[in-house]
Amino acid sequence: MSWQTYVDEHLMCEIEGHHLASAAILGHDGTVWAQSADFPQFKPEEITGIMKDFDEPGHLAPTGMFVAGAKYMVIQGEPGAVIRGKKGAGGITIKKTGQALVVGIYDEPMTPGQCNMVVERLGDYLVEQGM
């Protein structure tokens, strides 16, 4: 299965009538493996900060997490595995696997829990596959 298929069929799937605003699978260096049509472009320093937070949980908490220049308040995730952020009525979930970052961005009416489920389910599957 191609990386784009994972984005199109697994991350952008419909859940209770809603779906993510955008999603992507990136390499740890920020290289885009696949993305939805309107996924925002990460800046290199944003990826560096996100990867540092996975290595040093709490690194982003004081400053917030930036994605394409937009600031997200970092909320409770899973240290070293999942970073979650909130911005207005929406937010972001990032799941780290051995080789990739699985990213989902949502807006209402999708809920944070629905976003977490979609992103973390695919991330857990990729971890099981050695990715």
Curated annotation (Swiss-Prot):
Tell me the compartments it is located in.
Cytoplasm, Cytoskeleton
Q: Which UniProt keywords apply?
A: Actin-binding, Allergen, Cytoplasm, Cytoskeleton, Disulfide bond, Phosphoprotein
Question: Is Disulfide bond among the key words of this record?
Answer: yes
Recorded GO molecular functions are:
actin monomer binding
Q: Which cysteines are joined by disulfide bonds?
A: 13-115
Known SMART domains for this protein? PROF
What CDD domains is this protein classified in?
PROF (cd00148)
Q: Where is this motif: Involved in PIP2 interaction?
A: 81-97
In-chain residues carrying the UniProt-annotated modification Phosphothreonine: 111
Gene3D superfamilies registered for this protein in UniProt = Dynein light chain 2a, cytoplasmic (3.30.450.30)
The organism's superkingdom is given as: Eukaryota
Modifications the protein undergoes after translation, according to the UniProt entry? Phosphorylated by MAP kinases.
Its GO CC terms are: cell cortex; cytoskeleton
Looking up InterPro entries in the UniProt record yields: PFN, PFN_euk, PFN_sf, Profilin_CS
Q: Miscellaneous notes for this chain? A: The variability of the residues taking part of IgE-binding epitopes might be responsible of the difference in cross-reactivity among olive pollen cultivars, and between distantly related pollen species, leading to a variable range of allergy reactions among atopic patients.
Chain's role:
Binds to actin and affects the structure of the cytoskeleton. At high concentrations, profilin prevents the polymerization of actin, whereas it enhances it at low concentrations. By binding to PIP2, it inhibits the formation of IP3 and DG.
Q: How does it assemble?
A: Occurs in many kinds of cells as a complex with monomeric actin in a 1:1 ratio.
Q: Which family does it belong to?
A: Belongs to the profilin family.
- Please give the name of this protein: Profilin-2
